[in-house]
């Protein structure tokens, strides 16, 4: 019997082989095997969702699993650099496993489509990779099914995507769910009107993202502003704004173009959603913000019971020309 010393411990050959076999049977943290019944259910669900997207006129697109680093750089603001899986090719280029599909699809649209092709409806299904901390307990590889509407910034297009989202959730078998709808420009309009510095804006964003509305209140109290603007800031912690509250917010927003436009868009969107008959699934939340800086319009997230994270995280990108991504 052969013996080896490792970390001052005497190991027999059989123990070493046993340890190696254990390592070969396990996956790294953040990834897992999907097999048997679970795999069958996942494939069935993916097919149901895919059929719904095709029904709404979306066309499949497949983009590479990895891209050049600058595709996912800070300009499009998807995932922090520290959370990207980065590696080098033989030519020394920095490559990244995709953390998100949108930048890749934007690149493809700029390459393959011209303005006359707009609007373009593209859908995708595949895995994304985010190198989150092991302590967060999140999967580092996950499957995304989604759609990108490029070149149509109309409210009717926003409403159609929300209708498609509701239908997708119903097709997946969900009955009890809610979709929170907001607008990215409400937050940016507030920070502009209040004259916040870049650092202050990031501090406020972090407070809102963490749902620390006591902190938001303290932050706002420390600022000098008029009563109208203070009341608009006060709407950030309301998760289900009613019609009369949105109308009151519209009055308060007069004189603040970005804020006014965002609320007016939500009010118009509300009428479209009533026509689709899906208003019971919708709530309005002006405190909803996006992690992605390239999202410029409507934001919405879907929730259901038994999950700690949104099961749908979508935002709409309004692009008038395929080269503007």
Predicted regions and their residues:
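Short glycine/threonine-rich loop-to-helix capping motif typified by GTGT followed
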Residues: 188-198, 293-300
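Short hydrophobic alpha-helical segments enriched in small aliphatic residues
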Residues: 7-9, 13
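Polyanion/phosphate-binding surface patch
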Residues: 61, 65-95
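Short, conserved phosphate-binding/catalytic loop or strand-edge motifs used
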Residues: 140-145, 181-189
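Auxiliary tRNA-acceptor-end handling modules of aminoacyl-tRNA synthetases
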Residues: 20-39
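Short, surface-exposed recognition loops or helix-turn segments adjacent to catalytic cores
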Residues: 176-186, 204, 283-289
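Positively charged, Gly/Ser-enriched RNA/tRNA-binding surfaces
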Residues: 38-56, 67-68, 81, 102-115, ...
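Acidic, His- and aromatic-enriched active-site or binding-groove loops in soluble protein domains
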Residues: 83-89, 196-216, 304
């Amino acid at each position: 019997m052969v013996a080896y010393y490792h970390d001052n411990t005497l190991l027999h050959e059989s123990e070493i082989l046993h340890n190696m076999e254990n390592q070969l049977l396990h996956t790294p943290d953040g990834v897992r095997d999907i097999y048997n019944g679970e795999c069958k259910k996942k494939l069935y669900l993916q097919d149901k969702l895919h059929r719904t997207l095709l029904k709404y006129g979306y066309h499949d697109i497949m983009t590479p699993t990895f891209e050049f680093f600058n595709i996912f750089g800070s300009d499009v603001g998807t995932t922090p650099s520290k959370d990207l899986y980065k590696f080098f090719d033989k030519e020394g280029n920095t490559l990244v496993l995709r953390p998100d599909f949108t930048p890749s699809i934007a690149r493809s649209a700029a390459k393959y489509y011209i303005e006359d092709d707009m609007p373009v409806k593209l859908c995708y299904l595949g895995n994304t990779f985010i190198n989150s901390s092991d302590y967060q307990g999140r999967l580092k590889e996950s499957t995304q099914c989604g759609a990108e509407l490029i070149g149509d910034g109309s409210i009717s297009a926003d409403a159609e995507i929300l209708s498609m989202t509701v239908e997708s959730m119903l097709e997946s078998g969900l009955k009890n769910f809610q979709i929170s709808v907001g607008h990215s420009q409400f937050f940016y309009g507030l920070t502009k009107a209040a004259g916040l510095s870049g650092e202050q804006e990031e501090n406020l964003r972090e407070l809102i993202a963490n749902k620390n509305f006591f902190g938001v209140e303290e932050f706002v109290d420390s600022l000098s502003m008029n009563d109208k603007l203070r009341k608009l800031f006060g709407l950030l912690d309301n998760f289900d704004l009613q019609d009369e509250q949105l109308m009151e917010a519209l009055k308060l927003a007069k004189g603040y173009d970005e804020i006014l436009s965002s609320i007016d868009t939500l009010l118009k969107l509300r009428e479209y959603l009533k026509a689709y008959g899906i208003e019971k699934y919708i709530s309005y939340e002006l405190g909803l913000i996006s992690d992605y800086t390239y999202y410029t319009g409507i934001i919405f997230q879907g929730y259901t019971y038994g999950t700690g994270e949104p099961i749908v995280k979508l935002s709409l990108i309004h692009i008038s020309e395929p080269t503007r991504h």
